[in-house]
């Protein structure tokens, strides 16, 4: 949003140390709470689609006398700093206690647009394949993106901590990158891990993680 002071306060419902922001990279399923300071005028709110020329636009009007900007105007903030996860710090109340992971579950994100064969660890979703986890463990999910697209990965039933300490349940894994997140296995059940680009999940980029209460 142009010409407005903005500050991130939460991501996926968890508090962070307030961080001033020009622009955000938001994946499907991610949520951010942002406080904005409005002046008198008309301000465009613009969302660009990653990898496409399309954009969604809205206007925030605080003064009936102000003229609206031209529809094609690009807010200068879109060319400013795009805040990344590493720049955010958690509020102390939501920080996971320090602990070494008891196990690591490696999740390689694979597939191509040409074949549309999106998968995890080279295999399409199979309800009989369940990542082994035990109740009470600190589990590290290691997302390894082998594709040329970015994938917002979501874990059901839990929230996880990123290396910076912020808590989330959905995280963007950029092309060619590896991202480790940690969570506590404290909610027994059978839980989905999937790409929140739902057409990728439908193609096969999802798997299961499960454990029983008191399992050791």
Task: List the model feature ranges, each with a label.
Residues 1, 35-36, 41-47, 107, ...:
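Short, structured motif recognition centered on aromatic/hydrophobic residues
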Residues 1-82, 166-169:
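Histidine- and aromatic-rich segments of cupredoxin/plastocyanin-like copper-binding domains
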Residues 4, 39, 50, 65, ...:
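Solvent-exposed coil/turn segments that connect beta secondary-structure elements
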Residues 8-40, 127-134, 157-189, 215-216:
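Extracytoplasmic beta-sandwich strand-turn segments characteristic of Greek-key/jelly-roll folds
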Residues 13-14, 56-151, 157-161, 168, ...:
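Edge beta-strand plus adjacent loop/short-helix module at the start
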Residues 41-44, 54, 147-151, 203:
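Short loop/turn segments at connectors of secondary-structure elements within structured domains
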Residues 48-52, 144-146, 196-200:
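Beta-strand-rich extracellular modules
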Residues 180-216:
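TerminUS-proximal long segments
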């Amino acid at each position: 949003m142009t010409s407005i002071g903005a500050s991130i306060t939460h991501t996926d419902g968890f508090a962070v140390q307030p961080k001033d922001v020009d622009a955000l990279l938001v994946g499907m399923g991610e949520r951010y709470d942002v406080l904005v300071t409005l002046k008198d005028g008309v301000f465009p709110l613009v969302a660009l689609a990653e990898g496409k020329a399309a954009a969604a636009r809205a206007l925030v009007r605080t003064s009936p006398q102000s003229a609206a900007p031209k529809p094609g105007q690009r807010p200068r903030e879109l060319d400013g700093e795009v805040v990344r996860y590493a720049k955010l710090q958690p509020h102390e109340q939501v920080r996971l206690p320090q602990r070494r992971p008891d196990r690591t579950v490696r999740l390689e994100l694979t597939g191509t647009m040409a074949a549309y064969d999106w998968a995890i660890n080279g295999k399409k979703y199979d309800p009989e394949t369940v990542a082994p986890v035990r109740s009470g463990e600190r589990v590290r999910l290691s997302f390894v993106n082998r594709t040329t697209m970015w994938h917002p990965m979501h874990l059901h039933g839990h929230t996880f901590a990123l290396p910076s300490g912020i808590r989330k349940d959905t995280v963007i894994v950029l092309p060619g990158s590896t991202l480790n997140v940690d969570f506590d296995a404290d909610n027994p059940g059978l839980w989905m891990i999937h790409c929140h680009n739902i057409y990728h999940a439908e193609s096969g980029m999802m798997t299961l993680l499960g454990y029983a209460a008191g399992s050791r």
